[in-house]
Design a protein with these regions (language model features):
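C-terminal, charged and often intrinsically disordered regions of DNA end-processing helicases
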Residues: 1-7, 296
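Hydrophobic (often cysteine-bearing) scaffold residues that line and stabilize catalytic clefts
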Residues: 7, 11, 75, 186-189
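Hydrophobic/aromatic-lined pockets within catalytic cores
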Residues: 19-27, 126, 157-161, 195-199
């Protein structure tokens, strides 16, 4: 990949890895022999072992600038704490009681309104729970109290931001905060996974946010956004967005040269270079984009 990463992203991956290595029976990853994603059996690690392995991987991350270097150093202290919050949250909903926990499942979902499939990879899904014994995980009811169902879990992390330089020359960091309501993009993502996986069995959605000192679990019992009718609406929002993008690209289907297609797209689309993350694509690609739009 040529896109630049950042310490926040690398830290989030580290936490996700640690949780998956501790709880998962199977983890989907690239199979070089078959040249595609496939499930691989996971030898579950202890919580301490999972954190240690995740930190070893995170330490290999190369910062892209000085601020990113400072964030990496700070997150080396707070990643283990964030992992511990994740363990508490996962244990609270009973992930450890499932005999089939799957991570990074490859989802390839076809919607007949679209020319291309919608693809993604789940953080975690798990089966064989009974709603009557699940406590906080009990669903509001697409399934019977004793019927097996699939819980689909999406995990998000929030990280401390660098602040002012202290008198001693060290950098201060603000505390990470949990959201009071889920992010709409996260809801659309989870809605897509639930829609695709509902073909297998009834599903229960979970959206979990972590910081180094706390966590919050959103489910259909405490968050109206995750009720089935509202999840369906978020899925529809996602599909309509995909339809608009396909309609836009269809305008240029007769053009042969990639540069011609880019040139025409630049005439029709506002680049939004001030967006907080759309253009985190690496210096080379960002410079190329600026060049394309500067001539329009």
């Amino acid at each position: 990949r040529e896109f630049e990463g950042n310490a926040n992203m690398a830290a989030g991956v580290a936490v996700n890895d640690a949780l998956q290595w501790h709880y998962s029976n199977d983890i989907w990853s690239f199979n070089p022999n078959k040249r595609k994603l496939a499930p691989h059996s996971n030898d579950k690690l202890s919580k301490d072992g999972a954190i240690a392995k995740a930190m070893e991987k995170f330490n290999e991350y190369v910062p892209v600038n000085e601020t990113d270097r400072l964030k990496k150093e700070h997150y080396q202290e707070t990643i283990p704490q964030t992992c511990q919050q994740g363990f508490i949250a996962f244990d609270k909903i009973g992930v450890q009681n499932s005999n089939k926990v799957v991570a990074e499942d490859s989802i390839n979902h076809t919607d007949n309104r679209l020319s291309l499939p919608i693809v993604g990879r789940t953080d975690l899904h798990f089966t064989d729970f009974n709603a009557s014994s699940q406590g906080v995980a009990a669903s509001s009811g697409d399934h019977g109290s004793d019927a097996p169902f699939l819980s689909v879990l999406e995990l998000k992390t929030s990280w401390q931001r660098p602040g002012r330089v202290r008198k001693d020359g060290t950098r201060s960091f603000s505390s990470a905060k949990l959201p009071s309501t889920p992010n709409i993009l996260h809801l659309q993502q989870l809605a897509f996974y639930c829609c695709a996986l509902r073909k297998q069995m009834p599903v229960s959605p979970y959206l979990i946010y972590l910081t180094e000192g706390d966590f919050i679990i959103f489910n259909e019992k405490n968050c109206a956004d995750l009720e089935p009718v509202n999840l369906k609406n978020y899925y529809e929002q996602l599909v309509q967005n995909c339809i608009r993008k396909e309609r836009l690209l269809a305008r240029y289907v007769d053009l042969d040269e990639p540069d011609m297609i880019l040139s025409e797209i630049a005439k029709d689309v506002e680049p939004m270079f001030d967006h907080p993350f759309y253009w985190n694509i690496g210096a080379k690609h960002y410079a190329r984009a600026k060049e394309i739009w500067s001539t329009k």
